[in-house]
Amino acid sequence: MALHPQAGRPHRDGSEAQAEAAAQDLGRLPSPSKVGAAVCRIQGLGHRAARRPRRGIGTTSASRVPRPGALMPATRNRPRFIHCRGQPPRTRVSSKRSKRSRIHPCHTEVPGWTHEKQMGSSVKERLRPELSQLDQDADDLEEEEAARLPVTSPDGLLMEGDKQPSPGQGPFFYIGGTNGASIISNYCESKGWQRTQDSHCEDYKLKWCEIKCRDNYCSFREGQQLLFQLPNNKLLTTKIGLLSALREHARTLSKARMLPSTQTKVLKMEEFFPETYRLDIRDERQAFFALFDETQMWICKPTASNQGKGIFLIRSQEEAAALQAKTQSIEDDPIYRKMPFRAPQARVVQRYVQNPLLLDGKKFDVRSYMLIACAMPYMVFFGHGYARLTLSLYNPHSSDLSGHLTNQFMQKKSPLYTLLKESTVWTMEHLNRYINDKFRKTKGLPRDWVFTTFTKRMQQIMSHCFLAVKSKLECKLGYFDLIGCDFLIDENFKVWLLEMNANPALHTNCEVLKAVIPGVVIETLDLALETCQKSLHSQKMLPLLSQRRFVLLYNGETTDLWPRLASSRPLNRLPNPNPNPNPNANPHPHPHPNPHPHPNPHPNANPHPPRPTCEAASSALSSARAAISERPGARKSMPSRGAPVCTPRKSRLSDSSGSSIAESEPSLCSGSLEGSRDTAREPSLGPPEEEREEEQRSTSHRGS
């Protein structure tokens, strides 16, 4: 039997004669309020086929009552809910539009209804128009209600399953955690952005998380989004990571100083970093316990912790022997050797600075900031912070850690903190006035020592640390990071770097912090936005309109041959307003940004020379790599993790003359560090084996 000519278009079949005939055969309509087994009596198919589940039809409920006059299949027993295995194909469930859930199945043939027989069933011809009419009525009702409802979802959030926001929504931002959340939220909302609570949202403009998550970096859209914290910033922000980076950098610089053409004075690690040993390495552990004596005090710290957690002092042979026995027993335990994730966190022991400079008899340190505003090219800044004081007077023989550690987490444990918390934080201006009054004449210090010598020394140390890890950091356009750096001043006014912290504390629980922290956060976001946009559109970085209090430490635009983005995705670059048809019009374009532009002598010359392309960078790198390979015993460079595929960066290689290997540290007498060139060119050798093991054990942490 041939199929009905209208069967291929069920939604357009309106034959009343067929509908009346089908209604007589199907019988009465089932009551949706009753519960029972719905059995369709179809001639020629048998009871087994009639009992088959109706996949693709969905479930029936009391809230979905058939329209009057709609045709339904006859049932012998009471109707019941039909159990469907899995979700029907191409089924869309409407949500948040009314209390009635409507299911729109695709018009496919389902078992037990219309295709039990492959060809020529008279039942099929009668049932198709009625089922099609039900679908058409539901679609009409759906469109009518949708036309009366607003398009946007509540609170401006993405509805479940949507990948892109509806017109008029977004951009979105996400904040994970409470550290500085109010400041960041107010900043983003002032720009018209909408906050989302969905941590898995991929359509965001800014994501600021306290704890790093691998998924954030896997779904990151380079050049389109901003993401707080570099993926492997632990090279700077963990004790072992910073120690290993400084040691490797020192070895590289010592080899460079052996060359006759490199006589530049560089900063030595022992000049600013206290003597430190790793307890997770047997040789270093034995060396420490061999040199320990009770005349010196040491401090033991976990490698990836902050807020003073897990820190204790070592002052006697008994304490040193107990620590040695504990570490040795753990290392020899076969259970912990087979279960690395249960092994205790790696630790370092650091020589305690026993003669710190005191403010009114209290120990203090200085929190400053290193901002990596852009990673392609690197734009690194220094920012002033504040001084942190202890509540109690300094006593080197005291066992109370609150007198040795200055962070707010430790000071809050004191019962006097609520009354005296304002005295635990000083502004840099307050510190400068105090040192001018108390120590300028007695110590022979220059005027405003805090803002001259001390500030330049902090900038020099930060630059040294950044250059030690620059070739290993994972960089993508849109990554940015704010790192808290803690400095200590001893009574001889020597500056020591204690540690660097990821996700620095941004709380504002006292007046000084209320005056300092918001400015740091706002300028951080401003610089991250501006540098990202300028890099994306191939514009000169300098001058930066959003730069106010931060000082530029490193400008990768003038020192690195850096590629734009991966060649797999082109960028939307700004058109050149002044094309240069004559290739000889400007034969010597200067690639360095000039904050004081001069008139262009050639009207057709391009005032903004193009940046080095991937091909030009590859050519320069090939010649440099060939020169290196000719030297006896030269090591071949390894590709950097996270670097784009198109070309490696020249900053990881040294030229044939060797002049670029010498590190150019900012001088203490220099007036500005802007545009300081990075001439340290060492191959990226990757982290050592013990550092890779520590990477698996280290975990993210909250602000300190």
From Swiss-Prot:
Domain of life according to the entry: Eukaryota
Binding site for ATP: 301, 307-308, 350-353, 363-365, 406-407
GO molecular function: ATP binding; metal ion binding; protein-glycine ligase activity; protein-glycine ligase activity, elongating
A Pfam cross-reference name: TTL
Residues annotated to bind Mg(2+) 2: 499, 501
Binding positions for a protein per the UniProt entry: 307
Gene3D superfamilies assigned: ATP-grasp fold, B domain
Binding annotation for Mg(2+) 1: 486, 499
Any Gene Ontology CC annotation: cilium
Biased composition (Basic residues): 93-105
Record protein name field: Protein polyglycylase TTLL10
Protein's organism: Mus musculus (Mouse)
